[in-house]
């Protein structure tokens, strides 16, 4: 399976499939852009068995039982629009279905008034909110997501597909940030200050998507490095989601902040960055531009 399906799409216009609050109750962002309905149906989906983090943990359980892990996936994001456009910007959203969801009225963003709107299979459904009629159905559940990040040696088809195959990839919900992640046992403490840090990390560790062979009685080091999208919000934190199997054979998960904006350290009791006052104005979606970083890196 991993040969044929090394990657899965962790986010797209029909929602983010990383995790769900019922599966990750201690993750305050587990509800990010979820589409909880079945495709083409108003019925709710069953969270269990539907999300990527749980699949990774289930794969570890299989390994613990001596069964080959079918869920050692890497991740990408993609749009899944049918328009030929990348609908990843909230302020320039082109939606998914061309003429069927081209206007704010069709997407249920503003009242439809007396307009007669068409959906995929006939007249669009309608819902009344505060005395106004809005289009319902699938378009109001769409989100402006996502993008695939690929670390290829060069911008050629052959090189990109080799990177996809080795899972040296990541997904974002739209921002064009750049993210590096390496693991190894022989990282020098001063690596982050070197101009050739990426070259040294490749030489002495494994990149995202790789497998690191465990050493007895020695913990690995992790190198994380993120650059913000210059046309989007600054970075607030770097997080690691740790998954493991406990002594009772049960899967466990922990969310750990490892780097915080402003040079502060995560709280050692909660493993969370302190609130730095960053806000989003829900009236116009503007954000605090001076409360984050253009770059975060840590080892």
Protein language model regions, located:
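C-terminal functional module detector
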Residues: 2-299
């Amino acid at each position: 399976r991993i040969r044929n399906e090394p990657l899965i799409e962790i986010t797209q216009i029909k929602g983010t499939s990383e995790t769900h609050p019922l599966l990750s109750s201690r993750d305050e962002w587990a509800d990010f852009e979820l589409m909880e309905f079945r495709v083409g149906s108003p019925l709710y989906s069953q969270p269990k068995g539907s999300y990527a983090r749980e699949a990774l943990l289930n794969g570890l359980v299989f390994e613990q039982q001596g069964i080959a892990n079918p869920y050692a996936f890497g991740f990408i994001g993609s749009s899944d629009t049918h328009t030929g456009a990348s609908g990843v910007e909230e302020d320039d959203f082109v939606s998914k279905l061309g003429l069927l969801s081209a206007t704010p009225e069709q997407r249920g963003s503003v009242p439809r008034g007396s307009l007669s709107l068409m959906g995929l299979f006939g007249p669009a459904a309608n819902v009344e909110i505060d005395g106004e009629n809005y289009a319902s159905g699938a378009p109001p559940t769409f989100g402006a997501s996502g993008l695939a990040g690929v670390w290829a040696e060069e911008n050629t088809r052959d090189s990109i597909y080799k990177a996809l195959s080795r899972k040296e990839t990541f997904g974002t919900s739209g921002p064009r940030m750049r993210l590096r992640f390496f693991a190894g046992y022989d990282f020098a403490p001063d690596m982050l200050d070197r101009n050739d840090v990426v070259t040294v990390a490749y030489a002495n560790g494994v990149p995202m998507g790789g497998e690191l062979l465990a050493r007895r009685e020695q913990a690995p080091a992790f190198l994380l490095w993120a650059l913000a999208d210059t046309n989007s919000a600054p970075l607030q934190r770097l997080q690691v989601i740790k998954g493991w199997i406990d002594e009772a054979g049960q899967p466990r998960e922990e969310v750990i902040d490892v780097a915080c904006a402003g040079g502060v350290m995560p709280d050692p009791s909660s493993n969370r960055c302190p609130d730095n006052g960053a806000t989003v104005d829900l009236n116009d979606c503007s954000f605090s531009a001076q409360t984050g970083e253009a770059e975060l890196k840590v080892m």
